[in-house]
Amino acid sequence: MDTSRKIIHIDMDAFYASVEQRDHPEFRGKPLIIGGDPNKRGVVSTCSYEARKYGVHSAMPTRQAAKLCPNGIFIHGNMAHYVEVSSQIREIFSRYTDVIEPLSLDEAYLDVTENKKGMKSATMVARDIQQTIYRELGLTASAGVSFNKFIAKIASDFKKPAGITVVAPEEAEAFLEQIPVTKFYGVGKVTAEKLHRLGIETGADLKKWSEWDLIRELHKHGYQLYRHVRGRSNNIVNPHRDRKSVGKETTFEFNVLDNRILEQSLMKFAKKVEERLIKLQKHGKTVVLKLRYSDFTTITKRLTLNEYTNDANQIYQAAALLLRESYKGQDSIRLIGLTVTNLKPVYFENLRLEGL
């Protein structure tokens, strides 16, 4: 395991909301929710820390957010402006290193093992980046510093907002033992429920399990979690990373025959995919449906649209059509997935935040 790399994960604090509060003094100190009209369909894209005190969080339906935070200020936001500010942040990163792997508009990995400032301490680099962003742009960022990307990303969320957390190689396992497993990469709702049933709540609980037992219970996720909790993970920051597809899938706790449940899953996936595509500034043209039957037979069906889209409803309609054509209730479904491929960048003037 290579522990010589110096990797920083920078995560802007409540990015969209913070930009709006910076630009609009009337929003400062108030619960601001980026998500449009709470009386219409939509989900929260992000919200200010004032709104989070009421329990509002990203991906929550805006109607629910309005109930939790009746005094909240709801706005649609301005994606083109967020893209512009994101490019300003990226320019600041480039003053320190060219080895930058963007994850979305508001977060990125930086390898500063060899940096342009000649700083030997990655902690100093991270702090300098935070101060520069605040001084020049009036925004705060949190940073995680470690020897691999997995730990750096977890660490950046540890002391939000405007915090910095450093995890040295010799501290990694002890640090990970205290972390809830829901914070581990790849642990979604289904995996989290399985871990909970197994009595695994923290990294320390996870570490008690053998590699074989985790693989038996969780398959490939078990192998990944076994490595992650021991600090073994990818430490290569890839500046040429380019997503070829965006998707979501789930394995049902019990095999499913009901088309309504399958369609509900596709709608949830479509909303998640829409959110991710907008963050990546991309839209796609091909929708792919994946079905795995109870006998583990797997099929994929695809539909290429007439135009590029990042709209959840259009994505769902295409996936639902594929489902109706492919599945006649002949056997129960173990897994369902939805992916959008054939991606390309969205021009700034066409970026949409409608319903988010």
Curated annotation (Swiss-Prot):
CC terms in the record's Gene Ontology section: cytosol
Entries under PANTHER family matching the protein: DNA POLYMERASE KAPPA (PTHR11076:SF33), DNA REPAIR POLYMERASE UMUC / TRANSFERASE FAMILY MEMBER (PTHR11076)
Function: Poorly processive, error-prone DNA polymerase involved in untargeted mutagenesis. Copies undamaged DNA at stalled replication forks, which arise in vivo from mismatched or misaligned primer ends. These misaligned primers can be extended by PolIV. Exhibits no 3'-5' exonuclease (proofreading) activity. May be involved in translesional synthesis, in conjunction with the beta clamp from PolIII.
Gene: dinB
Co-factor note (free text): Binds 2 magnesium ions per subunit.
Amino-acid positions noted as binding Mg(2+) in the UniProt annotation, renumbered to this chain: D11, D106
Gene3D superfamilies, per the entry: 3.30.70.270, 3.40.1170.60, 5' to 3' exonuclease, C-terminal subdomain (1.10.150.20), DNA polymerase, Y-family, little finger domain (3.30.1490.100)
Assembly and interaction partners: Monomer.
Protein name in UniProt: DNA polymerase IV
Main subcellular location: cytoplasm
One family name in Pfam for this protein: IMS
